[in-house]
């Protein structure tokens, strides 16, 4: 084939050379995607909720000859890490088995390879100067000491990644055969999973070693894919980053809250369809002029809404996602969530003082306030009470209160409330987004 992907290092000859702050160009050849939309739209959605790559269209010319329309995807490298985590030299891995084994565990983060880190080399690609001991210690905690997991894992970002993968049926990922993700250990010592390789999202890739669909699954089955399949069912090979995390009822409710947010903000309101139309119009002439594309121009025109059949069936994006939204809305944890209303900051906003915060909440059994004083530090969590003893006014009036001790000049905070049915964040994109308060 003429239209191959490209991975170009701009600093290969001149160390430190870059273009607009980027020293690597990764060009995807838009294979497995007749719509030409999957990768760009997926990254745009993901960036609302977690660190994820930027992506756009590129017409690629080589020696003044047009090779075709590509997707230009920001590399997950040291520059990416610096921008999102404020550091770049900590332990950094790619979950990328040297040989993908459809009958094996791949980069599933299980401890099956044993206690010698050498046995993990075939499954994980070390991107930093060191880190095998850190990775093994994390895997050991994930599999054997789950009660300590929050000390080694950014749980919220993990839940967002899983929510994204299951909402958009992005199974060429940790979900399907445990690949195509990164792990970076930030300055807090927490591992952060990072999405990668989204060209087969929206059910372009329909393979998984979840036992319910061992031999693959249809578009109709993708629509009703259970987002807790690796918890509710049997995984042929372990998925501890899902199953062991989902053992917590609270994490399951948080996960479903994130799924709800992704679906309501992008799918239910049809914004993804409108964005698809915009991108389709932007790419139209370039797709028409791409003589090396893998699918026809008619396929490109149709696949936003309708199935295209080639080697496999590629669902239309709206065909898949509108029906998936209807299905997900029926699941436990999607409906029946608490209502979070009025926020009130009580008392003077003075550095070093204690700051009381109240929140009006309906239909909640538990309300949490998460706060921190600096970017990228870990959120501390306080339980809020409606007992008349925590600055909340009258007991039982649905106003919950808590006090943040010895505040700094900047407070970043968010809320989480849950009942037996469902959970709700405020703001809904927390912890990636949060409220900010300046003190005196």
Question: How should these model regions be labeled?
Answer:
Residues 1, 124-176, 180-354:
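Middle-to-C-terminal accessory/interaction subdomains
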Residues 26-36, 393-400:
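Aromatic/His-enriched, Gly/Pro-containing loop or helix-boundary segments
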Residues 2-4, 23, 54-56, 65-69, ...:
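Residues that flank catalytic or metal-binding motifs in active/ligand-binding sites
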């Amino acid at each position: 084939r003429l239209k191959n992907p490209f991975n170009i290092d701009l600093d290969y000859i001149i160390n430190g050379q870059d273009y607009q702050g980027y020293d690597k160009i990764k060009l995807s050849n838009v294979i497995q995607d007749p719509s030409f939309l999957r990768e760009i739209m997926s990254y745009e959605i993901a960036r609302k909720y977690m660190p994820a790559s930027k992506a756009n269209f590129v017409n690629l010319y080589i020696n003044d000859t047009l090779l075709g329309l590509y997707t230009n995807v920001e590399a997950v490298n040291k520059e990416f890490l610096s921008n999102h985590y404020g550091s770049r030299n900590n332990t950094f891995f790619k979950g990328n088995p040297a040989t993908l084994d459809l009958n094996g565990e791949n980069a599933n983060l299980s401890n099956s390879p044993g206690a010698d880190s050498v046995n993990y080399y075939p499954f994980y690609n070390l991107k930093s100067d060191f880190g095998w001991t850190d990775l093994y210690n994390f895997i050991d905690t994930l599999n054997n000491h789950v009660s300590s997991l929050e000390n080694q894992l950014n749980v919220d970002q993990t839940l967002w990644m899983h929510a994204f993968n299951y909402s958009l049926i992005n199974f060429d990922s940790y979900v399907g055969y445990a690949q195509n993700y990164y792990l970076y250990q930030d300055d807090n010592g927490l591992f952060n999973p990072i999405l990668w390789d989204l060209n087969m999202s929206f059910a372009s890739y329909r393979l998984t070693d979840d036992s319910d669909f061992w031999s693959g699954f249809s578009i109709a089955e993708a629509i009703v894919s259970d987002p807790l399949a690796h918890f509710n069912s049997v995984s042929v090979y372990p998925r501890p980053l899902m199953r062991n995390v989902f053992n917590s009822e609270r994490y399951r409710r948080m996960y479903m809250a994130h799924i709800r947010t992704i679906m309501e903000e992008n799918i239910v309101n049809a914004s993804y369809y409108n964005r698809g139309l915009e991108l389709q119009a932007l790419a139209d002439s370039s797709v028409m002029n791409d003589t090396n594309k893998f699918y026809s121009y008619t396929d490109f025109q149709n696949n936003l809404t309708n199935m295209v059949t080639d080697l496999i069936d590629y669902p239309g994006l709206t065909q898949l996602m509108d029906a998936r939204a209807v299905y997900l809305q029926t699941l436990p944890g999607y409906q029946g969530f608490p209502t979070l209303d009025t926020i009130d900051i009580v008392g003077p906003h003075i550095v070093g003082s204690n700051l009381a915060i109240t929140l009006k909440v309906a239909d909640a059994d538990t309300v949490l306030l998460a706060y921190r004083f600096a970017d990228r530090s870990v959120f501390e969590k306080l339980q809020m009470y409606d007992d008349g003893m925590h600055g909340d006014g009258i007991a039982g009036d649905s106003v919950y209160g808590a006090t943040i001790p010895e505040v700094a000049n900047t407070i970043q905070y968010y809320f989480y409330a849950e009942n037996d049915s469902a959970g709700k964040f405020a703001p809904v994109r927390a912890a990636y987004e949060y409220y900010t308060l300046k003190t005196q």
